[in-house]
Amino acid sequence: MKLPVSILFFISVSQILAFNNVIVTQKEVEIGVGETASITFQIKNHTSSTLNQTRIQLSQSPYITNPDVVLVDNWWANVTVSGERPVAGEILEALNCTTDGEEVCSLDLLDAYSRITVIRSHWLAILIQIVGWTYFAAWSVSFYPQMYLNFKRKSVVGLNFDFLSLNLVGFGAYAMFNLLMYYNSHVKNIYSMENPRSPPPVLLNDVVFAVHAFLACFVTILQCIFYERDQQRISTKCIILIIGLVSFGFVSVVVTVLNKITILDFVVSLSYIKMAVTCCKYFPQAYFNYQRKSTVGWSIGNILLDFTGGSLDILQMVLQAINVNDWSAFYANPVKFGLGFVSIFFDIIFMIQHYALYPDAEVPHNEYHGVDNPDPDSIVRDAEHGAADNESMESTDPIIVHD
């Protein structure tokens, strides 16, 4: 069987470009204003000795200074760049090339680029890293106070099951999103084609956090199965919402299999599920606390850590914007920024409920005190009244208001 001439030509060109390509060994470079760095351009898999006399034309930018043209010597060319003004991710790339005896550049320049970030201060960059790891740790640890509280009380009374169910669905979708974006080569290839020369959208710490969060939610659900839960159930409204979210994910799978959308579009749809969950998951717990007039059973430690993580996340964005003089992160992705503020807003609501509105509530299993359940003054006063008052307290039914 003979192949069409166009296909044969494409294969031949692809084979040539696969050999004669230029790469940059330093894909990410960070320098301060007034500092310099050396970037290496290298011709890989060369097939002709004439390519050793190649001149590469480089891009120019007001943020960095570099030569217009660099001469390749012995298949290598070192380029010195200096930072002029703060900028994030400025691309230095090879625009064209000329070789003795050839009128057209025969080199593949697709990978001949470097992302250069010019910062104001290295000390500020170190602070940004510290803040980043701190909020990562705070968010990662934030799941454990609730699990510990459930274990100490041997009860999940006070933990709203709607919140927990939505959290499991949200982090399940988020974990799948990160796993596919980080490990699936097909997804990464499509992303690279649609977003050429963009940094990876998902890093390993994103994958670790998402999977860890999903497992933590799953363990908490197991506690709800084995510990006392009174009459608490998942509400009908929450079940309908979860069915809707799962159905959306299932439809996305179907249209992906039918080649109506790419697998990258399917992966992005998983992030929409997480965003939808974040927007609505806090309402059930806040309303549940209001109904019970108590936060006992709902760990304030979780909220304090989540508030710390969210606040430090925004602080890191501010510090990064200052260091590179780029505030686009706040308006270029308003959804992410808005969701962060939604979480912080509800964290403040929960802290007001716990410390101001319902600090002395009497509910079942309030005998565990500490950071999660402060010792109510009313219980201390009752203990001082003697046996008569104690008998009265023992005969009084716990105060719980059900849905």
From Swiss-Prot:
Domain PQ-loop: 124-190, 266-326
Record topological domains on the Cytoplasmic side: 144-162, 228-237, 284-294, 358-403
Segments on the Lumenal side according to the record's topology features: 1-122, 184-206, 259-260, 316-336
TM segment ranges: 123-143, 163-183, 207-227, 238-258, 261-283, 295-315, 337-357
Places the protein is found: Lysosome membrane; Cytoplasmic vesicle, Phagosome
Listed GO MF terms: L-cystine transmembrane transporter activity; symporter activity
Catalytic reaction list: L-cystine(out) + H(+)(out) = L-cystine(in) + H(+)(in)
Chief location bin: membrane
InterPro entries given in the database record: LC_transporter, PQ-loop_rpt
SMART domains hit by this protein: CTNS
Family according to the record: Belongs to the cystinosin family.
Function per UniProt: Cystine/H(+) symporter that mediates export of cystine, the oxidized dimer of cysteine, from lysosomes. May play a role in the degradation of engulfed apoptotic cells.
Annotated protein name in UniProt: Cystinosin homolog
Taxonomic source organism: Caenorhabditis briggsae
